[in-house]
Amino acid sequence: MTPSVDNNLKQGYQYLFEHLEQSRQRAQPNLVLQEIGSVKSVSAGIAIVHGLPSAGFEELLRFPGDIYGIAFNIDEHDIGVIMLGDYSQLNAGDEVKRTGRVVDIPVGADLIGRVIDPLGRTLDGKGNLTSTQRMAIERPAPEIMTRSPVTEPLQTGLKVLDALIPIGKGQRELIMGDRQTGKTSIAIDAILNQKDKNVLCVYCAIGQKSASVAKILATLKHHNAFEYTVVMVTEGNDPPGLDYIAPYAATSIGEYFMEQGRDVLIVYDDLTQHARSYRELSLLLRRPPGREAFPGDIFYLHSRLLERSTHLNEAHGGGSMTALPIIETEEQNMSAYIPTNLISITDGQIYLSPDLFSLGILPAVDVGKSVSRVGGKAQRSAFRKVSGALKLAYAQFEELETFARFGARLDANSLQTIEHGQRIRSCLKQAESSPLSVAAQIVILLALTNDLFDAIDLAAMDSAQSAAIDGLTSLPLPIIEKLEQAESIEEQDQHIILDMLSQALKPFAQGTLRSGDKIQPTVNEANG
């Protein structure tokens, strides 16, 4: 090799090395430190993940195919994950990555009128949500000093509730009863009655049958309730993890509007299925079982959910969220584990009797076993005046029913109590999806407490009530406005209303039972 060639090679190598050194110095590698775990096993609704030592409790983890799960059991080497999507395609060894965040859901006004799942995915075929604001599904309940007493009524449109078991804004009122006793119907009627009342509604269906959900959606659509309602749905074939997070996600949506100063009504249908899904997940994750195989924190599961419903004071917007949780009892057993838990958490319960339901007394509310612990303070004066003695009279009637089942001949006073009680029961009956206005309810209750229905045959009670409601239009406008506001009824106005009722009910008047007559079979007699 000649010296010139050797020099050229040296210069070339030197240039190359200098260029590489300059490139190395200019290079700024964009390295990202990332933990990657792997799927160890997959079973019904859960996965065991190995690795991810820095993952936090309830952190959202991402699996292949944009499937997500919640880190629920944090062990030394493994993580028990609640799956939130279709896990059937996952295999052992698949990569799992952290997201660094907890489960959240989109919130905002564009959710009104939509049907979504607990992850914010739309189910109604109307396109994706446009809201960019998100809230975590698990949030601490409002502090005591931010709350205000329950003072405003939430009208359900059902006479038996608004008169005898009143509900206030910010209250938690449990709806309980056996299967097929009309629990969901009461909640849906309450939603329908909020039309034009500036109350937003959130309906959360937890693990319900598709046919049942479709029927409810059709009812809401038929009555134009989607104008003020958000519907969240998990169906029976969804992973139990979605059932678990559904009520928390729905509550976050309600909280968003409550913090804007709005009044919200939220329905959980039902928390029995929610508890069962949580039990299934806990057993699969090998958490220690307790009573009825439920885990030890089952009480906290529902208490932290329902404590988020309240009435905020004016300094925090003055909004409210009223909760109507639904649970299913078995064989009328109100003392089972989940029912007693929820009775102790809530501010009262509405108990639906299968015996009343089988006799066609709808809504099948057992007034004796139902109570509203705080709603009475929110009841308007007009309601309180006309319904004050109803509960006592109804209780006396039911006591006499038990005595009358033996076919005993009753004296005149007992017969009068029976007659009046039967008409109370008839007045409290109400067709599904037909909530009544405040004025209509007060007029009927006023006629009832003044014994105007006692001379009317039971078979004509429905027609008589319709006539009484139709007579409202003949009243002076100021009186109608007072009735709609449920203001205190002055004696002069009451005379005018009673005169109208007497004229409206006169065509329906019939003779009453005489002393010594036997009464018709009763609820207790049918049960006997």
Curated annotation (Swiss-Prot):
It is found in: Cell inner membrane. Gene3D superfamilies: 2.40.30.20, ATP synthase alpha/beta chain, C-terminal domain, P-loop containing nucleotide triphosphate hydrolases. One of its GO terms (molecular function) is ADP binding. Its EC number is 7.1.2.2. Its main location: membrane. It holds the Pfam family ATP-synt_ab_N. ATP binds at G177, D178, R179, Q180, T181, G182, K183, T184. GO terms for cellular component: plasma membrane; proton-transporting ATP synthase complex. It is a peripheral membrane protein. Transmembrane segments: none annotated. It comes from the Bacteria. Disulfide bonds: none annotated. InterPro entries: Alt_ATP_synth_F1_asu (IPR017710), ATP_synth_asu-like_sf (IPR023366), ATP_synth_asu_C (IPR000793), ATP_synth_asu_C_sf (IPR038376), ATP_synth_F1_a_nt-bd_dom (IPR033732), ATP_synth_F1_asu (IPR005294), ATPase_a/bsu_AS (IPR020003), ATPase_F1/V1/A1_a/bsu_N (IPR004100). It catalyses: ATP + H2O + 4 H(+)(in) = ADP + phosphate + 5 H(+)(out). The record marks S370 as: Required for activity. The keyword Transport applies. Keywords: ATP synthesis, ATP-binding, Cell inner membrane, Cell membrane, CF(1), Hydrogen ion transport, Ion transport, Membrane, Nucleotide-binding, Translocase, Transport. CDD domains: ATP-synt_F1_alpha_C (cd18113), ATP-synt_F1_alpha_N (cd18116), F1-ATPase_alpha_CD (cd01132). Belongs to the ATPase alpha/beta chains family. F-type ATPases have 2 components, CF(1) - the catalytic core - and CF(0) - the membrane proton channel. CF(1) has five subunits: alpha(3), beta(3), gamma(1), delta(1), epsilon(1). CF(0) has three main subunits: a(1), b(2) and c(9-12). The alpha and beta chains form an alternating ring which encloses part of the gamma chain. CF(1) is attached to CF(0) by a central stalk formed by the gamma and epsilon chains, while a peripheral stalk is formed by the delta and b chains. Produces ATP from ADP in the presence of a proton gradient across the membrane. The alpha chain is a regulatory subunit. PANTHER family: ATP SYNTHASE SUBUNIT ALPHA, MITOCHONDRIAL. This is ATP synthase subunit alpha 1. The gene is atpA1.
